[in-house]
Amino acid sequence: MTLLAQERTTRVPAEDLRRTFKDVFSRLASGVCIVTFWRGARLHGFTATSVTSVSLNPLRILFCVAQASQSYPCLSPGSAVGISILTAEQRALSDRFASRSAFGAYDDVGVADASRDAPLLEGALGHITATIAEMIPSGDHAIVLCDVTSAHAAAGGNPLLYCSRTYHSLLHRI
């Protein structure tokens, strides 16, 4: 039996498998976004690397959110959300929105157009506004499917990336 075949047949303890699973996915480079919404009249949101396009007809995206997060109870079908694709210069914003925060903790964050149904962050590489169409519970997270209502791409910029549990920027094309 080859070593690879032996590895496939060996049972791995659940905690070891969970740790290895997280380690494998930490190597998948992802763009960094902040999903935002109004909580009353205040900006609220969270950092997400799980944002992806789903469909062109209809225009649909998804993101995932932990059910234990402060944001999860604020989201529901029909709610408006904004998705801002961050630049490498916006790392501090990513860190801020990645941790639990007190109500009103983002009052000083620049919003591109506060009159919108969904807030969008100033200086981002791209903006998408969307309406939540469906929330599908899956384990300890929920998959949130959204119908896109608007999209805007900045003229240029350097994206913020997350890989191997740290931030990176895109320095050159290969």
Language-model segments: which ranges?
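Basic, polyanion-binding surface patches
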Residues: 2-174
